[in-house]
Amino acid sequence: MNRVVVTGAGCVTPIGNSLDEFEKALYAGKNGIGKITRFELPDYKCTLAAEVKDFDPAARLDKNAIRKSDLYTIYALCAAEEAVGMSGIIGRVDPEEIGVYIGSGIGGFNTFCSEHENMLKNGARRVSPQFIPKMIGNIAAGSTAIHFGAKGPCIAHTTACATSATAIGEAYRAIQVGAATAMICGGSEATITPLAVAGFGNMQALSTATDPDAASLPFDKRRGGFVMGEGAGVLVLEEYEHAVARGAEILAEVVGYGTTCDAQHITAPDPT
């Protein structure tokens, strides 16, 4: 089995839109949770979310890519730009040996909601021909592959909250068995919309706290649900010997991955 290392990382997050910004904010204890600003909240039990702020996709992407993409794909492309740039794999790895595994729990939900509203208001003939390509759950992976000319395996995993971890783990396995030399992998989400917040809120999954510092409390007896967030995280994984041979900076090594299902309930964990 091949050894697998990390040679690039990039992110768009509620506390920073680059790895450097994110790291500094994380170590400083910055909280990315605040009152939802994207829409009015007259009937919502949940009023807080972790929104991406001060985000300028034009700093990394051209206007055409931005115009044709849902926000979740834009986040993914920007994070991938940073990760791939850091890794230096373009021109150093055969394009046929570069794969993309970028997943999303829901996909282009902003596009889904806006085009549904457009159809109800203006009729079916006014639905954008870009609706389906912008909305589908594999378009972030596909767009990333096109953007970098990556011609290896391209798969979009969807495993709810575990999506990014699944994509990274499966990318690790792909390199382990020799299916690729390098993998651009991770996940992206952009679902802070009225419908998504209402849906998660009404299933009592979201925190109803009004204090941002007391809203997200995992593994705490005071916990009351999760806080909706958004953004993207992307890694470049590479076969160890190849990374060493080209003098790449190695950030970390992936040494294991596994996945199971308790086959118990859609949302509740197995109590045993």
Language model: regions and residue ranges:
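Active-site-adjacent elements of ketosynthase-type condensing enzymes
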Residues: 41-51, 107-111, 190-216, 258-272
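Conserved beta-ketoacyl condensing-enzyme motif
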Residues: 6, 21-23, 27-159, 188-197
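Condensing-enzyme catalytic core mediating Claisen C-C bond formation in acyl metabolism
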Residues: 3-7, 27, 32-34, 211-272
